[in-house]
Regions:
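The substrate-binding groove and active-site-proximal loops of carbohydrate-active enzymes
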Residues: 206-213, 235-258, 322-342, 443-461, ...
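A short, well-structured beta->alpha microelement
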Residues: 212-218, 655-674
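Aromatic-lined substrate-binding rim segments of carbohydrate-active enzymes
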Residues: 217-315, 348-352, 466-473, 688
Length: 911
């Protein structure tokens, strides 16, 4: 039976009566154990294996009619890693199941206790369907839920909310505005390095990054704390125009930037103190691509890639420009880059001489898939993101010449006696599909990792080239901003951070994760980047917070964007998410007003003003308060060796709920001499680890006063080609296994060890999907048999007696190891920190972010208490008033709510 995953949050209900009620509504399958109190609707799943199902009444339906179910419930107790799923079962007249749908797996995770929720799902009754029976299924870790009201009925569509829009800031008289702006001194901006981190300077003054990206509310956002405007549309498109934002290119090598100039005049009139980062859209137009077809992205069949607006539609032979379709193109193409550079030069030179350019302090590079130069397909398990266009092949060969130098060196690397630097081509689909993952050995492995590495390197070099052109032709110091990825949210075209940091780019941004992380019942989705790595390489990190409000127009299918119901929910989202960025070392954020007028409301502005004040405080205090003693390292290159075989980002929920805020780095950073010292080191899936990196870990991290954790496969894609020698270096005996014993490790609850205190159920947080009668876990493609008799077994592979989580304490050193991908739980991290001598700022269970003078908490479990080793003064970010002092503060908020406080060392202890 095939499962279809649908979720519709915006529905109307037309209630129907059930045909009859079940006498025994709870069923346990595949080893699950439960208890059910029908008098109050409390259902408890008591253990890890299997699924517990609560079956509602059957409802008589008519084939062809669409129905929806809505179930109210709240979770009273849970172990993070638990899940709940609403499913609708189609039954024929005899009661036999003939179909089933379930909510999306990503929405099944349960994070919050005592927060009422409503699950909604709709289904169209198919041929032969006589009844629909809703089911609530519990899987994963133990949890207790209170089942509330169930409603079921015909689906009655509700019109989508049209949004609330206000007037844009007006255009001033052009001639007079230009005269006024001609009197201004040209603005400058740059990134300096202070106390081991990048700092933004604007006209000689240090600034937090507090920006508004939009085209509507310049005045209001600046009045409430924004110091930077990032333009959105408004004449920044070089070649590819839209109906609402025409291109600047006028033909015959000429550009018209009057619309851009007008937008700058509007910004200045709205707030004369605002400084502007101009978003430059670098997409080519279809006419140019048709004239230069060798630059169009091709699959192996020679079919052209088709983009629709900023997304990727697929491959085809035609486009519909009325639907904003155009050809997808090759980022690495030198011809494309020259085409863009022509426009960049023209824009920079125009702004250099225009009075309106005096308020410009930088540029934001946009283009390609998602407007952020993501590879054209998010995932590509069948083709590996190979581009068969001639422009890509030519660029690849040029890079191979740079890397290998001679035909003979390339032949040895690719194990191909016929290949030359002039004939090399990207791998075939057959080669890509020949193995699930690739290492760095000569032959097909090296060929594929070379080609995928080039995909990332070429994108980074393109961005740097564009940035350097703008800097040169603008003629004064300015900052260049763009979007980028890290192992937290991996994209194959954006995994060359070291290359990106070589000059030309100053600021990197990442978009906050959409739902479910943004929901009030989740731990948040910002700070989703290796921020400590960017700080180490002097790249300023900022967060794109495109958070919707109650004013935002609803667009069909965008349930995942987590529209807040009102100011209270908006506050819960942005205080949590802005606080996480600042506490993790980010330099600020921008609110992205995508449709316009999202934040044009006193309540929204009040909340935004509070977050901007938090950013100012963090900029002032970050070097005056204790730093985190916990570091996490993720392997940037793992996705270059295969699609989805490991993912440090899948452990982010455990990190967010651990009660600690780590510095998150790339694996390469262990070699950086500027790397600070920590007490707890966590390495996620160091699959490409080298001997040099391993030695650095042994020297810097594997100390008597520190704890090292390794979670996931180690060494299998790098020069070791095996996990065994990596773990042997720490004195732990293991054997590589062709496949894992299971996909999930369960804590051994018979073991009494400080590391497993309050740990129960499975290891990790994400990765559980409730099916019909069982669950599917995050797949582990690699195995390891732990054979060390001296290691203490803390957990075993589910359904086996094989060790899956161990600790080895030897000569005062501590190693915690599991082969499970993302194999850490929030409580395990908290316990490991205590073993390392760290005082966790909070207990595990809530989403708590503490660092750089910011303490932000989002309540998911027990009341939030923040603790420090020394006396601190506390301040209310909304008012700036002192709210207390001491070594402990309670954040008063209800489940699903957020609160932040500012802190500094008490006067007598300031350093």
């Amino acid at each position: 039976m095939k499962y279809r995953f649908l979720f519709f949050p915006l529905m109307g209900l037309c209630l129907a009566e059930p045909l009859f009620c079940m006498e025994s509504p709870v069923v346990d399958t595949n080893g699950s154990r439960s208890s059910f109190d029908a008098s109050n609707g409390i259902l408890s799943k008591l253990n890890l294996p299997g699924v517990t199902t609560w079956r509602a009444s059957k409802y008589k339906v008519s084939p062809g009619q669409e129905y929806e179910a809505a179930l109210e419930f709240s979770c009273e107790e849970l172990i993070p890693g638990a899940a709940a799923s609403l499913q609708l079962v189609s039954l024929d007249a005899s009661g036999r199941e003939i179909g089933r749908i379930a909510d999306p797996a990503r929405f099944q995770q349960v994070y919050a206790e005592n927060l009422p929720q409503k699950l909604k799902l709709r289904v169209k009754a198919g041929t032969g369907t006589a009844f629909i029976q809703p089911e609530l299924k519990l899987g994963g870790n133990p949890l207790k839920v209170r089942i509330g009201r169930m409603t079921f009925g015909k689906y009655v569509p509700k019109p989508l909310f049209k949004g609330i829009y206000g007037e844009k800031d007006p255009m001033p008289p052009r001639v007079f505005a230009l005269k006024d702006m001609a009197k201004l001194k040209a603005s400058e901006s740059w990134i300096a390095r202070e106390a081991g981190r990048p700092v933004l300077y604007i006209n000689g003054k240090k600034n937090a990054y507090k920006a508004y990206k939009g085209g509507t509310d310049y005045r209001l956002m600046c009045e409430n704390g924004a110091n930077i405007i990032v333009t959105h549309g408004g004449g920044g498109a070089l070649y590819w125009g839209k109906e609402w934002d025409k291109q600047a290119y006028a033909g015959n090598g000429k550009f018209d930037f009057k619309r851009l100039e007008d937008n700058l005049l509007r910004i200045y009139a709205a707030n004369p103190d605002a400084k502007v980062i101009v978003t430059v859209e670098c997409d080519p137009d279809n006419a140019w691509l048709e004239a230069h077809p060798e630059n169009i992205y091709l699959n192996e069949k020679g079919e052209r890639g088709v983009a629709r607006y900023t997304g990727f539609k697929g491959f085809g032979s035609s486009i519909n420009q009325k639907k904003q379709e155009r050809w997808a193109w090759t980022y690495a193409s030198e011809a494309y880059q020259r085409h863009v550079i022509q426009g960049l030069k023209a824009m920079a030179e125009f702004l250099k001489q225009s009075p309106a350019g005096n308020i410009v302090i930088g540029f934001c590079l946009a283009g390609g898939h998602d407007g952020q130069y993501v590879q054209w397909r998010y995932g590509d398990e069948t083709a590996g993101h190979a581009d068969y266009s001639e422009s890509f092949q030519a660029a690849l060969r040029k890079w191979l010449k740079e890397k290998y130098g001679t035909d003979e060196a390339l032949r040895r690397a690719w194990n191909d006696p016929e290949i030359t630097l002039d004939t090399a081509r990207v791998f075939t689909g057959k080669e890509w599909r020949s193995k699930p993952y690739f290492d760095t050995e000569p032959g097909i492995d090296r060929k594929i990792t070379d080609c995928r590495t080039f995909l990332s390197v070429s994108t980074a070099r393109m961005l740097r080239k564009f940035g350097n052109v703008l800097k040169e032709y603008f003629g004064r110091r300015c900052v260049i901003q763009t979007w980028y990825s890290s192992p937290v949210w991996r994209q194959t075209s954006r995994l060359a951070a070291e290359e990106l940091a070589k000059g030309g780019i100053d600021i990197v941004a990442q978009v906050t994760d959409y739902a479910p992380p943004r929901l009030a019942r989740a731990p948040g989705g910002s700070a989703n980047y290796t921020i400590a790595d960017s700080n180490l390489h002097n790249l300023l990190y900022v967060q794109e917070m495109d958070h919707r409000t109650w004013r935002t127009q609803e667009v069909g299918g965008w349930n995942y964007t987590a529209y807040p119901s009102g100011p209270a929910e908006f506050r819960s989202q942005v205080i949590r998410d802005a606080g996480s960025v600042l506490a993790a070392g980010g330099s600020g954020f921008y609110y992205y007003d995508m449709f316009g007028s999202w934040y044009h409301d006193p309540e929204a502005l009040k909340i935004i003003r509070e977050t901007y004040r938090m950013a100012d405080w963090a900029e002032q205090k970050r070097n005056q308060v204790p730093r985190t003693e916990f570091a996490v390292f993720m392997d940037e290159r793992d996705r270059l060796h295969g699609e989805g075989i490991a993912n440090g980002g899948s452990a982010m929920k455990s990190l967010r709920m651990s009660g600690l805020t780590p510095d998150i780095y790339m694996l390469d950073d262990i070699l950086n001499p500027e790397l600070p010292e920590y007490k707890l080191y966590l390495f996620f899936s160091p699959m490409t680890i080298t001997r040099e990196q391993l030695n650095a870990i042994l020297e810097k991290a594997y100390r008597k006063d520190a704890v090292v954790m390794i979670a996931g496969p180690a060494g299998v894609c790098g020069p070791f080609r095996s996990a065994e020698p990596v773990l042997k270096a720490f004195g732990l005996q293991i054997q590589d296994s062709m496949k894992p014993f299971s996909n999930v490790v369960a804590f051994d609850e018979t073991v009494k060890d400080p590391l497993t205190e309050r740990c129960t159920g499975r290891l990790g947080t994400l990765g559980v999907t409730i099916r019909k009668d069982d669950v599917a876990w995050l797949r582990n493609p690699f195995g390891a048999k732990i054979t060390d008799a001296a290691a203490i077994v803390l957990g075993r592979w589910l359904g086996t007696s094989e060790p899956g989580l161990v600790v080895k304490r030897s000569e005062g050193r501590t190693l915690i190891y599991t082969p499970q991908i993302a194999g850490v739980s929030a409580q395990l991290i908290n316990n490991a920190a205590k073993e390392a001598g760290i005082l966790p700022p909070s207990e595990a269970g809530n989403a708590v972010y503490v660092g750089n003078g910011i303490a932000a908490g989002h309540r998911l479990a027990d009341p939030i208490v923040i603790r420090f080793r020394e006396d601190m003064n506390f301040y209310d970010p909304a008012t700036g008033e002192k709210s207390g002092s001491g070594r402990e503060i309670r954040l008063d908020c209800k489940p699903g709510e957020s609160r932040a406080v500012l802190y500094e060392r008490a006067v007598s202890q300031k350093k």
